[in-house]
Amino acid sequence: MASEHLEHKLALLPDKPGCYLMKNINDQIIYVGKAKNLKNRVRSYFKSSHTGKVAKMVSEVADFETIVTSTNKESFLLEITLIQKHQPYFNIKLKKGTGYPYIKITNERDPQIKIVSKIKKDGGYYFGPYPNVYAAEETMHFIQKVYPLRRCNGYQGRPCLYYHMGQCLGACFKEVPKSDYEEQIKKIKSFLSGNTATVKRQLTKKMQRAAENMEFERAAEIRDQLHYIEVTVEKQKIISNDKTPRDLFNFYMDKGWLSIQIFFIRQARLMKREKRLFPIVDTAVEEMTSFILQFYNRRNNILPHEILLPKGLPNKEISEILGVPVRTPVRGEKRDLLAMAHENAQLSLDEKFRLLEMDQSKTTGAMKEITDALGLPEGHRIEAFDHSHIQGADPVSAMVVFINGEPAKNFYRKYKLKTVINHADEAASTREVIRRRYSRLLKENKPMPDMIFMDGGEIQMDAAKDVLENELGLEIPVVGMVKNDKHQTADLLFGDDDHHINLNPRSQGFYLVQRIQDEVHRFAITFHRRVHTKHSLSSRLDEIKGVGPRTRTKLLKKYGSITKIAQASVDEIHSLGINRPTAQLIKVSLQKNAEVAKGSSHD
């Protein structure tokens, strides 16, 4: 089940293609994926049941990020880059082997096209990466049919089979002019860059001609090639045409907040994305300019060879200060990348505002729902109390404080009850803790809470109201938090006759009551366990002859538990300033107790 934070972010996902980055509690990226529809894909992880590796991954997700792209093809290319960059644990299968395949045109007299796993500085032309070998082979086979180079092993004195099939220029039996290869390579590069109009026209004419000649199999084959172009070969804006290291900045401003996206382009690929969100006091241009200059100065980054910025910024001044070219692209893929960064900046800020609205509804909005239901003026501070004991032993009380719907742990308090000893008395426990808490606030002239919540029913409420009104002269609304037979938050008790106030169980007000009740119960139980454990240790040591308060304090301070004292040697106990006979008696007594406890555990 997704946390509240994740639920809120899931509700804000866009219906757009892109990549998503799953993060664990340490903010480490543990999985990178792509999706045609980010909203549907990311939500599916948390709205469906899973098994195995997927279930394990989902269980570790504490947060996620998304990067919107223009097409699904861009999503794939970005996914590959992000996986190679971050090496996420749950993408392990994608990382195995020799890496992602590329299509290469070799730097030879008679060049050929092949699939490789690494890029080398050998003068060849590389295209990709592709998601797998199959995808690369599909593209290579298409090129071999439409733009043939050399497909055989070279000169052999006779035409090869591929020459007869139209998939080889004939290096097998003749000297092919270099200009022929250069022309084909030019067409291949244009085609793989997304310029498909020319080849589509050519193939359409061939398909029509084949159909007219009743060559239906040939027409169907060409039809499949056209379909391949339409669904697979798109202009890949996420990849730059050259390998110049670039940083790209764009921003979006609304309601006094500035959202910045930074794309780091290296080796013709988007290697990294960073985002910043913060309120601003100056104009967007001034704040953005200051941010860019501080970004490189503070981080001590290695400057790229070029910085791309949106229009309206002082490019000349920034360039002079940083010492690198700063440009604003007006067309082509760089402009499209700027547009993508702007869209992501807007989405990030929209998400921020929606999350702030949701947080407000959970806190101050929830407080208003409660006060409205109780018929009280709007309040800000709630103090809640609960008691804890084991069959009356070691009774304690605890108080938690919520201000504007959020826990204020600095104001939490713990109480060891003094008037209730070795028996359970909810009314007496309530009277004591309420008296101690609010008589002190009166004495110190400190502000009172707007409401007091008691974990319990009429007994606790009546006791609290009696002390407040009749002993201290205070008028503070007292509300009871009632649980059902499943020990879950049910409703509230309030008013002179302690009548039930029903809150909508799906409302933020109800969730706040639930959080308060769970928190005060947790705090009381934790405190009681510590008190009871310490008391039990003291009791067991007090039973040993010769162990008084001073010796007991030495032992507990040094070892902290009966088990660790029992494991200590006589010499170690003696070294604390305890005489040897007593040290020996402590050792023997605790060992006997441990053996008895061990034996009884097997009964």
From Swiss-Prot:
Residues 15-92 form the GIY-YIG domain. Belongs to the UvrC family. The UvrABC repair system catalyzes the recognition and processing of DNA lesions. UvrC both incises the 5' and 3' sides of the lesion. The N-terminal half is responsible for the 3' incision and the C-terminal half is responsible for the 5' incision. Keywords: Cytoplasm, DNA damage, DNA excision, DNA repair, Excision nuclease, SOS response. InterPro entries: GIY-YIG_endonuc, GIY-YIG_endonuc_sf, GIY-YIG_UvrC_Cho, RuvA_2-like, UVR_dom, UVR_dom_sf, UvrABC_protein_C, UvrC. It comes from Limosilactobacillus reuteri (strain DSM 20016). One of its GO terms (cellular component) is excinuclease repair complex. This is UvrABC system protein C. The keyword DNA repair applies. SUPFAM superfamilies: C-terminal UvrC-binding domain of UvrB, GIY-YIG endonuclease, RuvA domain 2-like. GO terms for biological process: nucleotide-excision repair; SOS response. Residues 197-232 form the UVR domain. The keyword Magnesium does not apply. Its main location: cytoplasm. Interacts with UvrB in an incision complex. It is found in: Cytoplasm.
